[in-house]
Each structure stands twice: as C-alpha cells, then as structure tokens.
Amino acid sequence: MPVEALYWKDGRLYVLDQTRLPEETVYVTCSSYRDAAEAIKTMRVRGAPAIGAVGAFGLVLGALETGGDRESFLARLREIAGVLRDTRPTAVNLDWALERMLARAVETLGEPGALRAALLAEAQAIVREDIEANRRMGLFGRELIPDPARILTHCNAGALATAGYGTALGVIRAAREAGKQVKVFAGETRPFLQGARLTAWELMREGIEVVLVADNMAGYLMAREGLDLVIVGADRVAANGDVANKIGTYSLAVLARAHGIPFYVAVPLSTVDLRTAIGRDIPIEERDPAELTHFRGRRVAPQGVAVWNPAFDVTPNELITALITDAGVLKPPFGEALRRAVGSGRRE
C-alpha cells in the first residue's frame, strides 16, 4: 500500500520524515506552525503538493495558537503564512495553498473559533482534492503508457511527494492497475538521492519492477535500453508551459529529445502558475553547499571548494511532449491550453 506523507490527528500534524528513509519509517509531530515550517525547510517533507498540504495545516496550527479579535487574528494569520511561504521558494503549491487558506479565513463570518474550524476544513479539502487530482492524472496518463513499457523517472513524484497516490508515479501506478507491464528506471537524483531513497522504496513496496541507475547513466540508458518514455513531476509550471523540477530534469529532457523518446510531465493544476510568464522568471532555490561537499556527515570534497547547489532547473516547453494534468493531457502549444484548463478546473 502507498505510504502517507502526512496526516492530521487530534490537533496535531504528523509528517513522515523522508530524510530517514529508507532505513526508518518515522513520523515527526508538528505541534506548531514553526514545526511545520521546519519540516518543509529541512526536507523532512518534500514534493510540491505535499509541501502545500503541510503549509495549509501549518496555518491551522498557527490559528490554534492565535487569539484576539477577528482583525488581529487575521493579521497574525498573514504573518504566519509569510513564515511558511519563505521556507522554500520554488514550489508554487505552497503559495497557492496558503493564499487559498487565507481567502477562506477572510470569507468566513464570525470570530476566531469559527475561522479555526473553517481553516481545518479547508486544509482537509486541499488534501482530499490533491488525491482526487492525482488519481485523475493517473487515468489520463495511463493511456500514454504502452504495454509493456520501459520508463525512466527522476526524483520522487509519488505518494511521498503528494497528499497521496502521486503524480508521475501515480501515472505508473494507474498503468499497472490497468494490467500493463511496466519496468521503471529510477535515477538516483543527486545530491539528495530522492530517486534512490524514495522512488525505489515506494515502487518496491508495491511490487513494481524498478532498476536504480546513476544520474550520469541516463544517456547511455536511452541509447542501450530503448526506453518508451520519460515521466517526471514538477514544482512549478509557468504560463507558457516551461517547467521547474528537480535539478537534472532539463538534462533528461535534452537527452530524451536527442533519442526520440517522449518526455512527459505529470502535474496537478495547483502547480500551474499563470502569474509567472516564462520559466526563467521562476525563483530557483539554492541549498546548503554541504549537500554536495558532505555525505552522511562525512566530507567528500576538498575544504574550501566553491559550490553551486541549485535545487531545481527549468525545462523549456519545446522539450516537453505533453503535460499530464487532472484536467486532461495537454499538448503544445501549452499557453492557451493551460489558461483554459486552469480557468475551468481549479479553484482559485
């Protein structure tokens, strides 16, 4: 069974600590919005939809800590949302979820007690809707999967990265549930090893055939093994269809184009940012140099070496075969298709 990345119980948020996988399955307790912010910042939880859900519940935790009259309560909520929003800048779901939560608070009549109840209901709706969206993506996307299929994926876009079921891995799950034979090649995804630690673990739990490969093997893998497709998730999609995803995605898209292999991005509409016109306008998070210079606490690079460690890159829309969304499969040109899909299929 797919694992839960997060759940709410008795006024607390429980987050699966993904930094400890695959060795340990441990949930950390978030009792305050600061705990939720720390879980996001330290990548105990990661993946754009999952980050959005944790941010939403983080605002609920903040509301439970906040008193005063209605106006002071709303002002404090905005401050807490700012703290949560600043944890990771690239994944747009976090900002989207927080804006949705704040809008729900403003439109709810009554004093703080009523607002707290409304916020909890909204956070639970965000989780429920994400799972439903992922399952719809799976149904749309599985039609693109041949039988049998040899698939390369990158990072982790499964149940661990979402409220449940997954985006890219959700499509693979749906194909498997439809009786198709799939073999997945999981890129290790340096430097945080989400592919090695998380994707391989998820797929093995469900009995889906998976082969772990080093990131720098991708070109040779495509030339040697005759892949049927590459499928990844996304942390933000610009209005023109450019996609920000885990560092290394752009390289895979270039290689896929060179080898004539379809390159698909599975993404819920909550990850589409129509306010960002093109990919180069997407803010790219840069992380701690120690993620490259150290491995499990041990230095593996010379002391004092310069490090550049962007967590994401941007894949131009012209390298993308299709966007698999919860509103259907979108083909290029993506601009108008995204505007129509968001306008008809997403709650703002």
Curated annotation (Swiss-Prot):
Gene3D superfamilies: translation initiation factor eif-2b, domain 1 (1.20.120.420), Translation initiation factor eif-2b, domain 2 (3.40.50.10470)
Lineage: Bacteria, Bacillati, Bacillota, Clostridia, Thermoanaerobacterales
Pfam families: IF-2B
Signal peptide per UniProt: none
Assigned protein family: Belongs to the eIF-2B alpha/beta/delta subunits family. MtnA subfamily.
Positions annotated to bind substrate: R46, G47, A48, R88, Q194, N245, K246
Record-linked InterPro entries: IF-2B-related, IF-M1Pi, IF_2B-like_C, Initiation_fac_2B_a/b/d, M1Pi_N, NagB/RpiA_transferase-like
GO BP terms: L-methionine salvage from methylthioadenosine
Molecular function per GO: S-methyl-5-thioribose-1-phosphate isomerase activity
Reactions listed under catalytic activity: 5-(methylsulfanyl)-alpha-D-ribose 1-phosphate = 5-(methylsulfanyl)-D-ribulose 1-phosphate
Broad EC category: isomerase
E.C. no: 5.3.1.23
Active site positions: D235 (proton donor)
Function: Catalyzes the interconversion of methylthioribose-1-phosphate (MTR-1-P) into methylthioribulose-1-phosphate (MTRu-1-P).
Protein name, as recorded: Methylthioribose-1-phosphate isomerase
Functional pathway: Amino-acid biosynthesis; L-methionine biosynthesis via salvage pathway; L-methionine from S-methyl-5-thio-alpha-D-ribose 1-phosphate: step 1/6
Keyword hit for Isomerase: yes
Keywords: Amino-acid biosynthesis, Isomerase, Methionine biosynthesis
Organism domain of life: Bacteria
Disulfide pairings: none
Site (Transition state stabilizer): C155
